[in-house]
Amino acid sequence: MKQPLGVILAGGQATRMGGGDKGLLPLGDGTLLSSVIDRLEQQVADMALNANGDATRFAAFDLPILPDSIDGFVGPLAGVLAGLDWAAAQGADTIVTAAADTPFFPCDLVPHLLLASEGMTHPLVLAATPDAKRGTARHPTFGLWPVALRDDLRTALQGGLRKVVLWTDQHGGRSALFPDEAAFFNVNTPDDLAQAERML
């Protein structure tokens, strides 16, 4: 399998942060988004950013900007689809997604996802961590996605499907278990941002 392309999902509305782009919030010497870029670019062949609205606000990052192709705010699957369409144009087989508001995700995210996908015709794997109540908790914005299923995903979104795990389960998606739940800590509130600073 060719090395996946990377797609950072930054299409959320950030309502609990007062709106705007969470990825552009300061963290350490950079931003949430720059932290995510630094971690992901070491693991993928090339990278793009899924975001809607004025693309010039991300110009400093020098990445292709992929807007959602499905009208309305329909959630992360629309960003996945935008990434799959971009990857298809590059001749790639798969993408790995990461969320722009989750700066501490594992540095071995991609190798673990690829390992979990061995033997799959259409590699489809979500990151997961141990959960005391549910056994495991899946992290649907962190996954390995096959370009071959992009038209099926488009049809599902046009039909109203929004929940990531419903679609992945329909296609026999697997989970890749990561031991550290804190690695998937995401910033949703000002308090979360303060905690992220303390975690540096």
What name fits each language-model region?
Residues 1-161, 166-185, 190-192, 198-200:
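Nucleotide and nucleotide-moiety/phosphate-recognizing core
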